[in-house]
Every structure is written in C-alpha cells, then in structure tokens.
UniProtKB/Swiss-Prot annotation:
Role description: The RuvA-RuvB-RuvC complex processes Holliday junction (HJ) DNA during genetic recombination and DNA repair, while the RuvA-RuvB complex plays an important role in the rescue of blocked DNA replication forks via replication fork reversal (RFR). RuvA specifically binds to HJ cruciform DNA, conferring on it an open structure. The RuvB hexamer acts as an ATP-dependent pump, pulling dsDNA into and through the RuvAB complex. RuvB forms 2 homohexamers on either side of HJ DNA bound by 1 or 2 RuvA tetramers; 4 subunits per hexamer contact DNA at a time.
Record carries keyword ATP-binding: yes
Gene name of this polypeptide: ruvB
Family in the record: Belongs to the RuvB family.
Organism: Helicobacter pylori (strain HPAG1)
Subunit note: Homohexamer. Forms an RuvA(8)-RuvB(12)-Holliday junction (HJ) complex. HJ DNA is sandwiched between 2 RuvA tetramers; dsDNA enters through RuvA and exits via RuvB. An RuvB hexamer assembles on each DNA strand where it exits the tetramer. Each RuvB hexamer is contacted by two RuvA subunits (via domain III) on 2 adjacent RuvB subunits; this complex drives branch migration. In the full resolvosome a probable DNA-RuvA(4)-RuvB(12)-RuvC(2) complex forms which resolves the HJ.
Lineage: Bacteria, Pseudomonadati, Campylobacterota, Epsilonproteobacteria, Campylobacterales
Region (Small ATPAse domain (RuvB-S)): 183-253
UniProt keyword ATP-binding, yes or no: yes
Gene Ontology MF: a single term: ATP hydrolysis activity
Sequence positions that bind ATP: L21, R22, G63, K66, T67, S68, E129, D130, F131, R172, Y182, R219
Name of the featured protein: Holliday junction branch migration complex subunit RuvB
Length: 336
C-alpha cells in the first residue's frame, strides 16, 4: 500500500519538524483536559512532597500527544526525560544501562511498551516497585544475583495496544490515562497555533477545513497543514485561503470525513459482505496490509465514529457505512 497522508505514524522527515511544533507548557497543550487536570494535581502534590511521580501509562491511537504531554510533565517536574522504545530494549543489559544512568526524579519514557519481552519485564518489576535492579551473573548453580539500588524515578509507558500489556506490568502503573480523539475546534486551534510558529498566514475557514479532515488527530492535522502550505507556496500565495486548502486536500486524496483510499477500501470490503462478519486476517490479505496496522491505524477512528462493529466473529459494516458508500443492505434491496 502506498504511503498515506493520514498515516498515524511519524514519518522520518517529520521528526525535527514535529519537535519544533511540540507544545512546551500546559497552556500550549490543547485538548485532553481531564488528563491535564489530573496530572497537574499529581505534579503539584509530588513537588510539595519532594518525591518522584507515580509511574503512569498513556494508551490510545498514535498521534494524540503521548510524547508531547510527557515532555511537559518533565518540564513541570524540573527534571530530565529519557526517551526510548520497547523494541530498542533487547537484553536486560540494555535496560540496566538506561536505569543506572537515571538521576533522582528523572522520567523514563518507553514507547510501544506492550512490545517488551517477558524477560525484560521481569527486570523492570523490582525497578518500578522498589527502585532496585536485580542483575543475575553467571548461570546454573553458580549464578549470583547482585542488587543495585536505583534513584526514585518515574516510568511513563505509552502504547497503542493496552490489551497486549501483561497484567503484572499494567498493575504496576499508579496512573493510567486513555488519550481521546480531539474535537474539530481543538484541532483548528492547534493548526492556527502551528501556523504562527511556521510564519504562515491562514484563514479561519481553512484551519476549520483541515481540522475537519484530520481524523481527530493532531499529528495528521499538522501534516496536512504543512502539505497545504506547500500548495500555497507553489501557487505564489502567502495566505492559505479556503480555495487553496480545498484544492490541496482533494489532491492529497483526503475527503471531507478525513478518509483516504485505504479507509474507503476497508469500508467497501465490509459493506459488500452484506452483514456477514469479516475476519481480520481476511481484511489484511485483501488489503495487502498487516493486521497490526489495520487494528492500530485504520480501525480506531472508524470505530469511534460508528462505521463498523467488532464482534467475536469479525468486523461488520454499520448502516452508516452503507449510507456513506451508497451500498444497499440486503434488507433494503427489492426483487423488482
């Protein structure tokens, strides 16, 4: 499948740009109000007690601000943050090297934490509970365990698949937060703030149009903003008006609902099944896509907006999908 403009993963060329647009203060972070409120209370209490924060877990679809909010937490706690991802921690020694380099109250952010191996989790448990690292040297009867004390730290885990976390690991997080999709008004505000940082003039209705097509996700909103800005530059326009915005978004293949070819192909597959559940493996084979991408990238927004139902037997298109695609259900078809 070709690269999607609404892909939820960070593209390689976007990393530095995303950092430059990342909010650094609570007042700059738009949305997730309930999470922000709870975190502000926890941070205030931890600072008054002069303690590290409880370990916390952020889960939800990609691109909703898990990393950004973790950076703000570190700044509010006036401490350092170490960023890594579970696939990078292959051996217990990798984790030990990270943990032993942390200072008191530092934050360790592990992305894709559901991908930690059971062996790594076993090393992590005493570190989370007792701030202690148990290192096994040797093997067999001669094996010895060396205990290394660690400074109090905060582990922030981020995952798109909370259901894949082992129960022992999940239970060790003192706080757990589900990241929600953003409203169009929140996304429009994010877009306008980003446009200011990019020194780009943008019309209100243009920001609203981009927001409407951003699938409730800031990462996609910022990507679309930058692509529309490219179209404006080519058109020799210093202003992103509605005409340029509509032309750009249509050329990018993102419709009024934020759907692209992959979304429509997915929904068509379900709708044409005429109420019969379609298994994930069948969908993946038909779309030539891996199951994880379908579950983590394509389905969450469609599911949240009522375009499909998940059952034990598979996925089923809803009447909303049939209406969108103008594919009648068997019940609505007549013999004449």
């Amino acid at each position: 499948m070709k690269e999607r403009i609404v892909n939820l993963e960070t593209l390689d060329f976007e990393t530095s740009q995303e950092v430059s647009l990342r909010p650094s203060l609570w007042e700059d972070f738009i949305g997730q109000e309930k999470i922000k409120s709870n975190l502000q209370i926890s941070i205030c209490a931890a600072k008054k007690r002069q303690e590290s924060l409880d370990h916390m877990l952020f889960f939800g679809p990609p691109g909703l601000g898990k990393t950004s909010i973790s950076h703000i937490i570190a700044k509010e706690m006036e401490t350092n943050i170490k960023i890594t991802a579970a696939p990078m921690i292959e051996k217990s020694g990798d984790l030990a090297a990270i943990l032993t380099n942390l200072q008191a109250k530092d934050i360790l952010f592990i992305d894709e934490i559901h991908r930690l191996s059971p062996a790594i989790e076993e090393v992590l448990y005493p570190a989370m509970e007792d701030f202690r690292l148990d290192i096994i040297i040797g093997s067999g009867p001669a094996a010895q365990t060396i205990k290394i004390d660690l400074p109090p730290f905060t582990l922030i885990g981020a995952t798109t698949r909370a259901g894949m976390l082992s129960n022992p690991l999940r239970d060790r997080f003192g706080m757990s937060f589900r990241m929600q999709f953003y409203s169009p008004s929140e996304l429009a505000l994010i877009i306008k703030k980003a446009a200011i940082k990019l020194n780009q003039d943008i019309k209100e209705e243009s920001a609203d149009e981009i927001a409407k097509r951003s699938r409730g996700t800031p990462r996609i909103a910022l990507r679309l903003l930058k692509r529309v800005r490219d179209f404006a530059l080519v058109k020799n326009s210093s202003l992103m008006d509605l005409n340029i915005t509509l032309h750009a978004l249509n050329e990018l293949g993102v419709n009024e609902l934020g759907f692209d070819e992959a979304d429509l192909a997915y929904l068509s597959l379900l709708a044409n099944a005429q109420g019969r559940p379609v298994g994930l493996n069948t969908i993946a084979a038909s779309m030539r896509e891996d199951e994880g991408t379908i579950e983590d990238v394509i389905e969450p927004f469609l599911l949240a907006n009522g375009y499909l139902e998940r059952t034990a037997k598979g996925r089923i298109a809803t009447p909303k999908t049939h209406a969108l695609l103008k594919i009648p259900t068997l019940k609505s078809q007549t013999l004449f």
